[in-house]
């Protein structure tokens, strides 16, 4: 079976930065003003999680809470005993244009028992969090990144995401077409060629793809290519070279597709992205 995450992670990395390890007692509020998400590991204790006016979530077993994008939340724990957390900021390269971050739901909660393959990583992470070893920060950050990858695996394998790219990658047939696009965006992909990758008829493939991924195959292909083009523009590469690498026959063709997808020309987008940075 093709590696569903290899091309995604090769093009769009995820990173973590640990910012807390220890007890949280009483009420702790985290706002949505920072430009990154958060991953919290609840090692022990009871926690009430609140998201605005939504019904509170009660956690009474070791669990993880992933917020791939900024989202205000509050933790309410016992004032005396609290709960033990290890927390990290998470960042998806490219921000909103990162297809991995964009494909995740706003909030994921999983009991740690649902990640059996991740137990050795979690044990090492908790051990490192308690230590004062040299390189502790770097070690914790890398371990959190491994946990993130394991979360993606679990969401696909257990069908936790109902729509979007990850839902498509969870489908035995659609995943073959998606991986082919991710690995070779420069190919001249037609609907027939993608349907052949999936082993389906054109009509069945187009319908299934739209129902699961939420986009037509052509729209998804354009979004993936333009996402790659944006990454290459940040790296300062020439538009001519980018056009060839992401599957457009000329700079003009790429510019038309880029404007259709983003509302800006590649030059305008690069200038505005540089200002924002």
Feature locations, PLM:
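N-terminal regulatory/effector-sensing and dimerization cores
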Residues: 16-106
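Solvent-exposed, amphipathic alpha-helical segments
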Residues: 45, 117-128, 176-184, 228, ...
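Short, Lys/Arg-enriched, Trp-marked, Pro/Gly-tolerant hinge/linker segments that flank
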Residues: 107-116, 129-144, 148-187, 191-198, ...
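Aromatic/histidine-rich interaction motifs
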Residues: 99-123
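Terminal helix-turn-helix DNA-binding modules in bacterial transcription factors
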Residues: 179, 183, 187-193, 200, ...
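A short, N-terminal "cap"/entry segment at the start of jelly-roll beta-barrel domains
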Residues: 1-15, 26-30, 106-113, 131
